[in-house]
From Swiss-Prot:
Protein name listed in UniProt: Protein Smg homolog
Taxonomic source organism: Methylobacillus flagellatus (strain ATCC 51484 / DSM 6875 / VKM B-1610 / KT)
Disulfide bonds: none
Family classification: Belongs to the Smg family.
Domain of life the protein comes from: Bacteria
A Pfam family this chain is assigned to: DUF494
Length: 150
């Protein structure tokens, strides 16, 4: 499913091409993706869109996020560090962080690594029209140097 999401983002959403659901489904199937993964990606992205609209509510910024056991098992240490880096850099708000965590946990794979987390952050910020933040994340995604946390 994750590969379908990345393909959709790179080929359609990033370029503001938004074919209807049926056309996109046919194109993804023709590109070699499994129908179950296509449907899962559509559901995942629909949830991202609806949650993005709701995530405007501000969470307190002074708190510390304690991750559940399920989250620490699924999300790699690099993923958690990357989200902390983005939050400390004021790229992600606490509400956006929660959105990213939710969407990461909704993936069908057993572990979510740094690459997947970067893509989820990218999609979430892009979906919320955070162009400048998006550019920062895109640079972080394709720059092999990891951010230094102090």
């Amino acid at each position: 499913m994750f590969e379908v999401l990345v393909y959709m983002f790179e080929n359609y959403f990033e370029s503001d091409i938004h074919p209807d659901h049926e056309t996109l489904s046919k194109e993804l199937f023709a590109a070699g993706f499994d129908q179950e993964d296509i449907n899962g990606a559509f559901d995942w992205y629909s949830a991202l869109e609806s949650m993005s609209e709701e995530s405007d509510a501000q969470l307190g910024t002074a708190g510390i996020r304690i991750y559940s056991e399920a989250e620490t098992k699924r999300l790699s240490a690099d993923s958690l560090s990357f989200m902390m880096f983005l939050e400390q850099a004021k790229v992600l708000t606490p509400a956006q962080r929660e959105l990213v965590i939710d969407r990461a946990m909704a993936l069908s794979q057993p572990e979510v690594g740094l690459e997947e987390t970067r893509w989820i952050v990218l999609m979430a910020l892009w979906n919320q029209d955070k162009a400048n933040d998006y550019l920062f994340v895109e640079d972080a995604m394709f720059n092999d140097n990891r951010p230094t946390l102090h």
